[in-house]
Amino acid sequence: MSRAFLSTCCLTFCLLLASTVTGQRGRKSDMVAPTASADRLNVAATHASLASASWTSGLDLRSVGPTVMSGRVVDLDVNPDNPAEFVVAYATGGIWHTTDQGTSFEPLFDHGLMMFVGALAVDWEQKHIWAGTGEVNASRSSYAGVGVYFSEDWGTTWQHRGLEESHHIGRIVLDEGDGIYVAALGPLYTEGRPETQRGIYHSTDQGASWQLLLNGTEAGRPEAGAIDLIVDPNRTDHLYAALWDRTRRSWDFTEGGPGSGVFESEDGGASWVYLSSEEYGFPASENIGRMGLAYHAAADKLYIIVDNQNVKPEEEEDSEVADLKGEDFRGMTTAEFAALDSAALADFLEDNGFPEEADATSVFRRVADGELNPEALADFLGDANAAMFNPPIIGAEVYRWTGQSLQQGKTTASDSTGARWERTHEEGLDEVCYSYCYYFGLIAVDPSNEDRVVIGGVPLLESTDGGATWTSIAQDNVHVDHHHIWINPNNPQHVINGNDGGINVTLDGGDHWTSCNSPAVGQFYAVAVDDADPYRIYGGLQDNGTWRGPSGYEAGPRWHQTGDYPYDRLNGGDGMRIEVDTRDNETVYTGYQFGWYSRSNRQTGDRARLHPEHTLGETPLRWNWQTPIHLSRHHQDVLYMGSNRFHRSLDQGDNFETLSGDLTRGSKKGNVPFGTLTALHESPLRFGRLAVGSDDGLVHLSPDGGYTWEARTPPAPQAAPRRTLWVTEVLWSHHSADRLYVTFNGYRHDHFAPYLYASDDNGQTWSRLGDDGTVRSGLPMEPINALAESEDVEGLLFCGTDGGLYASLDGGFTWALAHPDLPRVPVHDLVIQERENELVIGTHGRSIWVLDLNPLIEGLTEAEATAPEALLLSMETPEDLTWREGWGERGYGWGEPWTPKVQLPAFIPSHGDYTIQLMDSAQTVLGQKDFKGLHRGWQNLSFSPKKTSGDGYLEPGAYTLGLMSSDGSTGRLEVSWSIVEEED
C-alpha cells in the first residue's frame, strides 16, 4: 500500500495553483490592517463548511490532560441560594459549571465561535448566562473576542448579542428586567479606529441594542476603555466605573495614561462625575494604569486598587559610596570612570552578571587603554527585558473614597462635601504586582464587614482594618497571580479564589484551601514527545512550568489515593520549548521566558544552565518570550538556539558559538524585547540546512550549519518597520530537501488572517496556501501558530490556529476541520509521534490532546488521497480475535467485566448511522452493533463479539462481518473474520 500517496508533481501543481490565486487576492492590500469584526464572525460559516468537508472526524481523539496545574481564571458567578454551585470563566478555556463546590465541572461554552472569555454574569432565577468574550489582563496571550454572547438554555446554545468591536470585556453586570451593563475595554494592539467599542454600555432589550454611557472622551482620551464597573445594589442608578488607558505593541507596553480614571453616576449613566482629580487626593493621573473597584453598599464605601506607574522615589543611600547603576555610565568620560570607587565597580559587575573575566581591574585597564568606552557597561545591560523593570515604579496602591458622594454637577473639591481619596496604608505595597500590575486589578470587600478587604496580585492579601495593614491568606497549595475573589455574604469564612492555577476554595477564611482543578484547561505554549515505549508527552505552560506525562494518560481521581500524579514537573516559570534526546529519552532541554534554558536528566541528576551570553563591548542579545531551540535529529549532541542571532552548541549546550549577525530588522525602542528570533528548524533530510524566522517578519536560510545566511522571506503583506507579521513556524519537509513551509501571525496587530507559505526551491519562490478565496476549502480567518507534516504520508499537513486544528491531504492547498470534538481553542504547538502515528496537540486553554492517525495512514491509497470526495464505504479485515476464558467476568469483586474489543478499520463516506453484523456461514445474524451519528472519514469502529441473544460471547470459529449504513444507502460490505482458539 502506498504511503507517499501524493506525488511531487501533483503537489507542485497545487502550489503553483495556490500561488496564482494568492497573487490575485494579495494585490488588494499590502498592509497589515486590523481585521473587521464581520470577517471574524463569518468564521462560523467557514467552520461549518470545513466541518462538513472533514475526512478525519472519525479518528480517535482523546484528552490526555494534565489537569492538576489548571489554567487562568478570569471571572466566576456564584448561585446566591446555593454557594456550592458556581460558574467559572477561564481566559482561553471557556466556561465551566459546578454544583458540588468544585469537585466536578461540566463545560458550557465549547461549541461557540471561540473560547476566549473576559467576564460573565448569570441570572440564576431564569438560568440565563451572559459571556463577554476577550479577557482584559493584557498578557501576551490575551485573545480578542467578538462581543457578548447570551444563552437562555444553560449553555446548550449561544446567541451573539453585539459589541463585536469591543475585543476585550472586563465586567458584565445584570440590571433590573432585561437590562445589562458591559464594561468594554477595546482592542489591545490598535488605536485610532472609530468603529471600536470602548467604554460603559447599557442595554434594556437583552443586547438587541446598546447605548454608550461613558468612554474615554470624558477624560480627553477616546482610546481609553472600561475595565471595571460597580452597580449599587441599593440604588441601581448609582454607578462607579473605571477606565484604563493602555497601549500594547509587539515591542512596547504603555500600561497607563491620562485616560485612566474613576467616574461616578447617580442617574444610570446619563451623566458622570470625574473622581480621579489630584485635588481629591488621587495620584497624578498621567501615569495611572489599571484599576479595580470594590464597593460596600451598606456602608456606601468605595475601595480602589491602583496601578501607580509613577516612578518610585529614590531611597537615601545608607553607605558613603552610592551603588552604581547602568545609567550612571551614560555620557561618562574616561577621567570620571577612572575616579570611580573600585569596590563599587566590583559590586556593580558582580550584581549585574558580567562575565567573570570582566572584573574591576580588567575593566579599569580596558577603559584606560581606550579599548572600551564607559557606556559599554550600560549597553551590556541595555536589553528590552531590563527596561521592563527599570526604573522602579510605585506599583499597587489601595485608596478609599471618604465622605459623601459628589452631587451631580459639582466637579471641584470646593463644591464637594469633604469627599476625597485616602491611601489606606502608610507603607508601600511592595512585591504585590512588581512591574506588571496590568495583569491584576483584583480587590474585594467583605459584604458583611466594610473593613475586611482582599487584594490580589502575585500574592493574595487580606486586611481587616480597612486596608491599613495586610497579611497573606494564600497557602502552599494556592497558585500565585490572582484574578478573582468571591466572599460569601452569608458566611464570610467561605471564599472562592480564581488565579493562574485555577480555582481554590476555603471554608475557614484562608487558613486552609482546596484546589478544584479537575478541568483540563492548561495553557500550553509548546509540546514535545520522546521515543520511549510507551512514549511520553512533554509540555510547557503559561506560568505553570514544564511537565512530562504518559501518552496514555486518562483523567481520574486514583492519584488522590496513591499520591502519584502521572505527570511530573520538570521546570518552573513559564514553560517554553522542549527538546528530548531520544538516544536515552531522559536528557531533556527545557526553559522559561526570555531564553533561560537548562539541560537535565532525571536519572543521572545532571543539570546545566544554557544561555548564550554576549561579551562586554558587544550589543546585548535580544531574547523572545518563547525563545526557539532545536536539537538536531542528525546528531543529538548538536543544539541550536536563537536570540536575535543564531547560536550553536556541539556538546549538548555546554558551550555555544554565536555564528550569525543580527537576523532581524534590528532593535526597536520599547520595554518588550523585539527584533528576536521566534522560529528555528533544521531539515530532517540534510544536516546543517537551517531556517529561522523572526518576530519582525523575516526568514533566513543557512545551507552550512549557520555559518552563512541569506534572507528568503515569503511575500507576506508587511509594512516595515511598524507593521510586520510574526513568524510562528519554519518547517522543512520530510519529503523534499528543498521544500520549506513558513507561517505568519498578525495577532499583535489585531490582524487575524491566516498566512501559510510553501517553497519547493529552497525559498527562491513562494506560494501562499490555504487561501483559495472560498469558504469551502480555505483556512478560516484565524492566525496560524503551528504546522506539522506527516513523515509517512506526503502532503498530509495539520495546521493549528487561534481557533482550532485543520487538516490537509494535498500539501495545504485545501483544508478541512481536523475533528469536531476538539474545542475551538488556540492550538499553539503540534508534533507527530511517528512510530505510533499519533498527533499531539498542545492547546492554550484546554491542555493536551492526541489524535490517532493510524486508520488514516494505513487506509490511504494514492487514488483515495487525490479524490477523497469520491470515496465509498470501505473497510479492512480486522485482526482475528483470540478466545479467552473469562470473557464477561469481573476481574475482582466489584470491578468492571472483562469485555473483548475488536477494531474494524473503515472509511465512512457520509455522516450518519451505521451497523456492524456478525454472521455465521448460513448468514444468520449472531451479533450486531449499531453506531449512531458516525462522522465522515477514516476511523476504527470498536465492537464486542456479543451474541444478540445476550447469552455471552461468540465461540471460536469462522464468521462474516458485514458493514452497512442503517438506511441501506451505502450498500453492504462483508469480510471473513475468525475467533481462534487460545493456545496452550
Located regions from the model:
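A short tyrosine-centered beta-strand micro-motif
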Residues: Y914, Q939, G957-L961
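C-terminal tail/sorting-segment detector
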Residues: L963-D984
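Glycine-centered tight-turn motifs at strand-turn-strand junctions
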Residues: G778-P780, V925-Y953
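Beta-strand-rich binding/interaction modules
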Residues: S600, H911-G927
